[in-house]
């Protein structure tokens, strides 16, 4: 069981803070990326001194790669992943590798998801505050990767799931195969969000892309989950469900 911690939801524009403990969540507020926002954030950190924090970042400047690598353990695995990460993401400061599954045939190699923030200089001021205040930072993770645990908690067991978040700064679409992240993209970023009517088109284009890249099997039926407290994606849900050839969509 995890103990109490603060979850930091960071974007290039701001950072939000969630006070989390088992069975309970409390929103502490948002802090804009400005001198005053950083000062207020520092005060909040001081008031919660000693609590571990997890930083969940959401930005268009992210990259994901799926790699199949030899099944090795210990130091050999660490060295293998370090070489592969440096090869794939040459200049990235924040990067990581997550073992997802083991192949069932051949050499039974391991399948990894490699991820990196291509441009994450905007994170530096927030991390500097945490460093100065000696905050125990348990990790930095992309939002799409963190949502693997959300699917598990929601008991979503569909083999092919597209998770669609309507956010104040854009539309996040993430594809999960058997609960594991395979692809994600953020539409909008720092620009104003698109009109809700475009969401169904974006979902359809994403499905075509996944099929074209052979990430999503051509015959697979995509299960779409729409997260939108404002209800602005209702029209997208209706459009998707009206076409029997399309994905099946439902709101949560």
Region spans (language model):
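Hydrophobic/aromatic-enriched cytosolic interaction surfaces used to assemble or bind macromolecules
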Residues: 1-252
């Amino acid at each position: 069981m995890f103990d109490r911690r603060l979850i930091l939801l960071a974007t290039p524009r701001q950072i939000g803070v969630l006070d989390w403990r088992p069975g309970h969540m409390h929103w502490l507020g948002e802090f804009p990326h400005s001198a005053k926002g950083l000062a207020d954030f520092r005060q909040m950190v001081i008031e919660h001194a000693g609590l571990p924090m997890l930083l969940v970042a959401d930005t268009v400047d992210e990259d994901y790669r799926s790699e199949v690598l030899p099944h090795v353990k210990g130091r050999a695995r660490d060295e293998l992943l370090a070489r592969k990460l440096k090869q794939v993401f040459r200049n990235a400061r924040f990067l990581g590798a997550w073992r997802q599954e083991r192949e069932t045939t051949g050499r039974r190699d391991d399948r990894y998801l490699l991820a990196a923030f291509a441009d994450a200089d905007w994170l530096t001021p927030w991390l500097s505050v945490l460093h100065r205040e000696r905050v125990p930072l348990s990790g930095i993770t992309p939002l799409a990767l963190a949502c693997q645990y959300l699917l598990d908690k929601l008991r979503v067991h569909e083999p092919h799931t597209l998770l669609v978040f309507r956010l104040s700064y854009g539309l996040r679409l993430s594809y999960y195969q058997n609960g594991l992240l395979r692809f994600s993209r953020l539409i909008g970023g720092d620009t104003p969000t698109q009109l809700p009517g475009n969401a169904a088109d974006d979902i359809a284009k994403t499905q075509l892309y996944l099929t074209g890249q052979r990430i999503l099997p051509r015959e697979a039926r995509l299960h779409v989950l729409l997260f939108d407290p404002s209800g602005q994606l209702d029209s997208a849900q209706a459009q998707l469900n009206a076409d029997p050839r399309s994905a099946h969509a439902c709101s949560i």
